[in-house]
């Protein structure tokens, strides 16, 4: 993704946060560092937004952390092992009070969705990385593509149902999303990203919004 486009993505995230906190007075909740799976709590008569970032850490993560810090906002980062030079940012995310979740080490659909064994080998590798950086393992995760993705069918029929059940039995809580700002498309500007986010959160009392830092 071109640097200037990523800058738009980051700025759109700032605008989104400002809109939530200033214009709508939303209450933002997040997963605590202890990774308590009961953290997704209802807040009566208030809208709740859970800000989540996938695919990092990367060269863009530090700027996102700076923005979140400026607005006193916490988020959840579902990390991968794709960029070893930025592993230290996992420790920084944790130290700043953000939550860390597993998004798989490789993010390789053909590999992780080929079998249950392959998926958990990748998950374990990611959790080992998180433990090395933060001193503790985590028990929250997000499947690449989400639980309803259809790409996985090419590699193993019914694998998502199998994995959703298996991760629960192993004590993990998995989280999809019900809104996105569309930043997976690197050819859209910040205005489009903001409008997409606002459209998707409309009429939702509890929002789990998907964004990317990698």
Model features per residue range: what roles?
Residues 28, 48, 96, 153, ...:
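Intrinsically disordered, low-complexity segments enriched in small/polar residues
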Residues 1-50, 66-75, 178, 191, ...:
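Terminal accessory/targeting
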Residues 85, 107-214:
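Catalytic domains of cell-wall/extracellular-matrix polysaccharide-remodeling enzymes
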